[in-house]
């Protein structure tokens, strides 16, 4: 049986930007089954976001092909900060912040990769034990300052200034690759396109210290841009997090289901494990019947299931269907809070009140005249039910444990009224 050509699959999926030695890597893969590869992430926050999925999807594909992925948490480098892609110096974190973030990220990674044939390392294990003289004697002499200055990540910062702390980051990242290569048999590093200089610095260090025939490879991923030219990864509300407390499964699902027709096939290739045949079929459906949004629905299902599991996907679909159909009464209080987290909100008391007065007092309607007109025209829904009687009394304690009243005006304009 022919061996699965993972590099060819990655190329088809548009997942490769640059490779340091494709011929050497192909030869290694043909002759060995033990490739180990890693990517690093510094614990600058307490949650991963969908930008992290870009390199992690590559690791996951290698894992599914039988290879050994390693994620390196930068407990050491995270205390300094990677200058890549930044115009200004990072604010340094306390040791307590770094430790807290490490624990949160580790839990999220284990959820994505499981515990079989997967490893999480922390560069504080070796960088934290290194003193300044060891750093200068054992590694510093292998780095030429003129070469370091010419690296894109440094050159772009020279005009406004870069501290020695951030300037030395590429040496520390090179030491990481050398350490993992020598002590853990990790042969390849992957990263974003802005990491090319750091990755090649690591390969150079490995070859200088352990010989040019030592297997060491690098692969970078293209910058993910949307069809409109903007950077992928943000929603209208900001970053899309993997932590369900920061971005609920419903919001996460909505981010993917709302992708542009021009982007959806690219994202299916990159962020799902669907076969080429399935993706080509969905591409054809998008071209012929774009209004059905079959590709977007499948994309949202696959990525939500990968990140939040079957339960998170089911929750997101239940909320989506309830909001689309208007049957919000079927939702639980936590589901309501997920669904309408970013909707306009208002406050009211527990007192029963005439619908017209309620709409004006909560500022959903600008005047009693407008409120009466909208109610008579059937444009107002209370807790999912149309109310066209201007004498209708809203009883705030009747639904949702007396915590909320949900007003819908027209087809999709929801307001979450919190009962105090």
From Swiss-Prot:
CDD domains: S4 (cd00165), TyrRS_core (cd00805)
Gene Ontology molecular functions: ATP binding; RNA binding; tyrosine-tRNA ligase activity
Binding annotation for L-tyrosine: 38, 169, 173
Function description: Catalyzes the attachment of tyrosine to tRNA(Tyr) in a two-step reaction: tyrosine is first activated by ATP to form Tyr-AMP and then transferred to the acceptor end of tRNA(Tyr).
Domain of life, source organism: Bacteria
Residue positions binding ATP: 234
Alphabetical list of HAMAP family matching this protein: Tyr_tRNA_synth_type1
Listed name of the protein: Tyrosine--tRNA ligase
Lineage of source species: Bacteria, Bacillati, Bacillota, Bacilli, Lactobacillales
Family to which this protein belongs: Belongs to the class-I aminoacyl-tRNA synthetase family. TyrS type 1 subfamily.
Biological processes, Gene Ontology terms: tyrosyl-tRNA aminoacylation
Quaternary structure and partners: Homodimer.
InterPro entries: aa-tRNA-synth_I_CS (IPR001412), aa-tRNA-synth_Ic (IPR002305), Rossmann-like_a/b/a_fold (IPR014729), S4_RNA-bd (IPR002942), S4_RNA-bd_sf (IPR036986), SYY-like_C (IPR054608), Tyr-tRNA-ligase (IPR002307), Tyr-tRNA-ligase_bac-type (IPR024088)
Broad class of enzyme this protein falls into: ligase
EC number, UniProt record: 6.1.1.1
Keywords attached to this entry: Aminoacyl-tRNA synthetase, ATP-binding, Cytoplasm, Ligase, Nucleotide-binding, Protein biosynthesis, RNA-binding
Record-level GO cellular component terms: cytosol
Short sequence motif 'HIGH' region: positions: 43-52
One Pfam family this sequence matches: SYY_C-terminal
Occurrences of domain S4 RNA-binding (ranges): 353-419
Residue numbers covered by motif 'KMSKS' region: 231-235
Localization terms from the record: Cytoplasm
Reaction(s) catalysed by this chain's protein: tRNA(Tyr) + L-tyrosine + ATP = L-tyrosyl-tRNA(Tyr) + AMP + diphosphate + H(+)
């Amino acid at each position: 049986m022919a061996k699965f050509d993972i590099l060819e699959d990655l190329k088809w999926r548009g997942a490769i930007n640059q490779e340091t030695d494709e011929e050497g890597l192909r030869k290694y893969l043909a002759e060995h089954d033990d490739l180990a590869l890693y990517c690093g992430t510094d614990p600058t926050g307490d949650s991963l976001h969908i930008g992290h999925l870009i390199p992690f999807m590559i690791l996951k594909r290698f894992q599914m092909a039988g290879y050994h992925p390693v994620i390196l948490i930068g407990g050491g480098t995270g205390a300094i900060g990677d200058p890549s892609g930044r115009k200004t110096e990072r604010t340094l974190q306390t040791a307590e912040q770094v430790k807290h973030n490490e624990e949160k990220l580790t839990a999220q990674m284990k959820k994505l990769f499981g515990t079989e044939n997967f490893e999480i390392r922390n560069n504080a294990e070796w960088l934290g034990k290194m003193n300044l003289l060891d750093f200068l004697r054992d590694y510093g002499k292998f780095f030429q300052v003129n070469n370091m200055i010419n690296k894109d990540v440094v050159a772009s910062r020279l005009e406004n200034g870069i501290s020695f702390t951030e300037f030395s980051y590429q040496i520390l990242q090179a030491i990481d690759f050398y350490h993992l290569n020598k002590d853990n048999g990790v042969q390849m590093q992957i990263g974003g396109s802005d990491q090319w200089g750091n990755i090649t610095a690591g390969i150079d260090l490995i070859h200088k210290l352990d010989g040019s025939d030592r297997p060491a490879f690098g692969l970078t991923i293209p910058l993910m841009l949307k069809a409109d030219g903007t950077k992928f990864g943000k929603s209208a509300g900001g970053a899309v997090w993997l932590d369900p407390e920061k971005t609920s499964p419903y919001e996460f699902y909505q981010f993917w289901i709302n992708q542009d027709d021009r982007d959806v096939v690219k994202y299916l290739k990159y962020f799902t494990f669907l076969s080429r045949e399935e993706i080509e079929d969905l591409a054809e459906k998008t071209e012929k019947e774009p209004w059905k949004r079959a590709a977007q629905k499948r994309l949202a299902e696959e990525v939500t299931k990968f990140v939040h599991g079957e339960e998170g996907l089911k929750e997101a679909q239940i909320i989506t269907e309830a909001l689309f159909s208007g049957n919000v009464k079927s939702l639980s209080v936590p589901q309501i809070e997920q669904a309408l987290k970013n909707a306009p909100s208002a406050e009211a008391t527990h007192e029963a009140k005439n619908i017209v007065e309620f709409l004006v007092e909560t500022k959903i309607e600008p005047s009693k005249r407008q409120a009466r007109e909208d109610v008579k025209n059937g444009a107002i829904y209370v807790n999912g039910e149309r109310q066209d009687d201007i004498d209708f009394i809203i009883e705030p304690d009747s639904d949702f444990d007396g915590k909320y009243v949900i007003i819908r005006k027209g087809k999709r304009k929801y307001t979450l009224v919190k009962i105090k």
